[in-house]
Amino acid sequence: MLHLFSYSDLNHSLLVFLALFFVLFYEAINGFHDTANAVSTLIYTRAMSAHVAVIMSGIFNFLGVLLGGLTVAYTIVHLLPNDLLLNATSKNALAMVFSMLLAAIIWNLSTWYFCLPASSSHSLIGAIIGIGLTNAFVTDSSLVDAFNIPKMTSVFLSLVFSPIIGLIIAGSLIFLLRYYLNNNKIFYRIHMTPLERKEKDGKKIPPFLIRMALILSSIGVSYAHGANDGQKGIGLIMLVLIGIVPSSFLVNLNTNKYEINCTKHTLNHLEKYFLEKNIKKSNIIKNKEEINNLVVRSQSYNSIKNIKNTKLLLKNISNYNDLSIKKRFQLRHYLLCISDSIDKKVNSSDICSKDKRFLIHSKKVILKTIEYAPMWIILIVALSLSIGTMIGWKRIVVTIGEKIGKKRMTYAQAMSAQITASFSIGIASYTGIPVSTTHILSSSVAGTMLIDGDGIQTKTIKNIALAWILTLPVSMLLSSFLYWIALFLI
């Protein structure tokens, strides 16, 4: 890690430090901005004291980042066009990162100040879109080519529909709990609010089994939040390092000889597969640019030629440190192009399930070279998120706990909302889809209130919906404007 600051140019080292600080600051804001999602239901059902709940949430956020993998991280990275990543100068990369993060931070702090549970994910993805748009206009390139359209579409749909799904599932759970446990002699208390429990039984805390269910479901939300949102921080740092220090981070220089040989064998199998299927024409990678020795672009190479070029680069290579910086650029480029070809074939209508499984597995193997994160990055992101979790949480907790429904949550409502959020976010993290923890949980709470007939506070719901609608376009325009100014200043 320390080698990042060892440049002879003091200004460069300082800018690298500031870029990393911005990412970690964003992640800390994400922590306290989204902690309410995990602890609000615990606090307002009195299942756990506020400080203990927040500390517990911080611990499981940390574990979520540490153990959650990297699928979401690289979904974020690949939202930006490969040409922008591969050809950005050090100054352009810094301008890109600072503009993106500053836009997301400004919006997140603004919504936090006004107690609105807006989405950190929406703001970050909006900022990334803004960078891509500005880059397309400045370089006079196609807007269609500026984005990974399939990836952008899936991310956009997940952000739009995940709150709706959360509302429906949580509402269904509360309906089932009402149907089966409303008159149950043992579990009828699950439909009490904390105040009703105190008036009837003279106790503040929930019954033991209900309390354990609330705590466990809250742990699930915290862990899932770390696994999903923490990965976004990892992806951001890798964006910073690939753009600013490409020689060290374009490929995983710690890849061992066995893993390199696995990549070579996989390339051999892929070459054989594509030759047998004779699908050269259907795997053209679209781009109008010519090959340039200094600038690596997504040329019109077909999959077989990309594989042959990659094999040529890796011939007699047992350590990626033996590759020159230029060849590391080329290796990353070819592997991304092969991955694009695999995606096109996997999504085609003329592929059998056996071939699809083979291609998906092969893609995972070859991308290990470029889709990675050093352990120190995972640790500092986990630490930033967990520290952020332990501060600044109270403002949004009040909104989630008191201002969505017209009365306080029952134990059943809290549990239904948390179970829905933990499973939804957990599945999204596993499949590599970035989702909004904030909107999934707040919509789940609203769903339980609607089904239970308690009613919701229209003003708060309108404010949350307004923040939901505005976050993406505002952060997009803000980052686009900041990046445009930065490009002219440098």
Curated annotation (Swiss-Prot):
One of its GO terms (cellular component) is plasma membrane. InterPro entries: Phos_transporter. Its main location: membrane. The keyword Membrane applies. It catalyses: phosphate(in) + H(+)(in) = phosphate(out) + H(+)(out). It is found in: Cell membrane. Keywords: Cell membrane, Membrane, Phosphate transport, Symport, Transmembrane, Transmembrane helix, Transport. One of its GO terms (biological process) is phosphate ion transmembrane transport. It is a multi-pass membrane protein. GO terms for molecular function: phosphate transmembrane transporter activity; symporter activity. The chain crosses the membrane at residues 12-32, 52-72, 94-114, 124-144, 155-175, 205-225, 233-253, 373-393, 421-441, 470-490. PANTHER family: LOW-AFFINITY INORGANIC PHOSPHATE TRANSPORTER PITA-RELATED, PHOSPHATE TRANSPORTER. Low-affinity inorganic phosphate transporter. Belongs to the inorganic phosphate transporter (PiT) (TC 2.A.20) family. Pit subfamily. This is Low-affinity inorganic phosphate transporter. It comes from Buchnera aphidicola subsp. Acyrthosiphon pisum (strain APS). The gene is pit.
